[in-house]
Amino acid sequence: SDLTFDQRVIALRMALKIDILPRLSFALMFPVGLELSAALGVVEPGLATRAISWSVSALWVVIVIGMVRAREPARARSLKHANVVLHWVLFLVVVAIGLTSVLGHGPFPAGWLGWKILLFGLIFFCGIMIDREFDPVSPAFARLAAEGSKPDIELAIKSAIDRSIVWVLTLYVLVVVIAFLGTARPS
């Protein structure tokens, strides 16, 4: 890399701080979307659906903020694990809701909104994979700090980032398609 170790540490810290905004936005996306859909008359969610949606979102926001603020490694690991478990549960639940809706048996209309929910569920999988592929960066950075730059360390960092970027781009494509479906509402 053309950057010094200290510059790379600063860049990584900045990236991790910036990363909180899309994570918080993602945590709020479903309940806000549900409320907007209700306001537009597209869906009529019951009080229980709204309460569950907002409660899960609030829990998720607490986990995300906790992950960023955790100072003790054990607490950070615990919150990260909770985040991964929540992502897997939400992936399965939202994909199931989207799929049953697309097939005409779910809580949402089968057309564009069913597809939007299904694709939204796939974003959870992208988030899981982004985190999983990025995981090797931390131990590689620790080695970089201890041993200095070596080809295998640089390769580990570059490979992890490159694999993460594939999932980030996939997530962006899903967001664009979801935005199109919500805007165009094709029949």
Which residues make up each language-model segment?
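Polytopic transmembrane helical bundles with strong interfacial aromatic enrichment
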Residues: S1-S187
